[in-house]
Amino acid sequence: MRALIEKVIEQALFEAKSRNVPIYTFALYYDHESPAVSVCIDTEEQSKATVKSMNTYSRIYFGRAVADGDLSGAALWRANIGRSLSLGDFHMVNVARTELAGDFVPGDDFFLALVQALVAAEAKVSAQSGNTESLLLCCSGKDDEVALWWSVA
């Protein structure tokens, strides 16, 4: 399984390099709905645009909740304070993807292999980042599309 995961990472890096995409966020993703391993890559510009759009939308409902005196409701519409982790809004979605067997049931060892493979590829991902100090790596977990995230700086 580790070799398959590493192949997906390598393919994503190849695609990003061939398209001259500076990597701001690199997400190794397990598609829980149709068993597959995939990579999504975001740029700083795309992330900022997504955050701005999210915050514009959220502000409407935040304001309504505050006007209604609903603090619990307002808390649901807090602003994003920095970076998008919404994989579907990334610059490159499913840039490299490999389907797994339809009956595949991931266990803790699978999710550990995801993280370990991405940690092992940190230097390669960093080499394609426009700014390694702001590079973020992400990985899916058993229950979350984005469960872990870390920086290399």
Residues of each region from the PLM?
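Short beta-strand micro-motifs enriched in acidic
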Residues: Y29-D31
